[in-house]
Amino acid sequence: MINITEIAFTVYPVSDIARARDFYQNLLGLPPSGIDDEIEGMPGKYWIEYEVGNATFAISNAWEPSGQAGPSVAFEVSDLEAAVAKLKEAGVRFVAENIDSPVCSFALITDPDGNGITIHKRKPSADQ
């Protein structure tokens, strides 16, 4: 058995790197990690990383998005209602919103390339 200790990173393929950078940095507020490089040997293809807590999220135009259902990333937010309002104001496409479970509340959106994103807020546990 292989001992997998953590997820190293999640990457989303994007068709327009500038548009994706604007969406993730300016709208969602992800802080760039400093890795924003053209991929060696692939002119015009970029890899951009964001540090989100203990995880790394990346975008790249090295391959085309499929437009089909695929992986999704969930971003934890401090204020779900405010995040949803800001995303609506920006015209972001919502797949679902106001989803409530015993442990969390969330909304499902897509980025400009149709990649799925969950905007998520954990509920305080009963023992806190």
Spans of features found by a protein language model:
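Vicinal oxygen chelate
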Residues: 1-3, 7-16, 35, 48-51, 62-128
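Core segments of cupin and vicinal oxygen chelate
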Residues: 2-5, 11-55
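Short polar/acidic secondary-structure junctions
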Residues: 38-40, 62-65, 99-100
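Generic preference for hydrophobic
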Residues: 57-59, 119
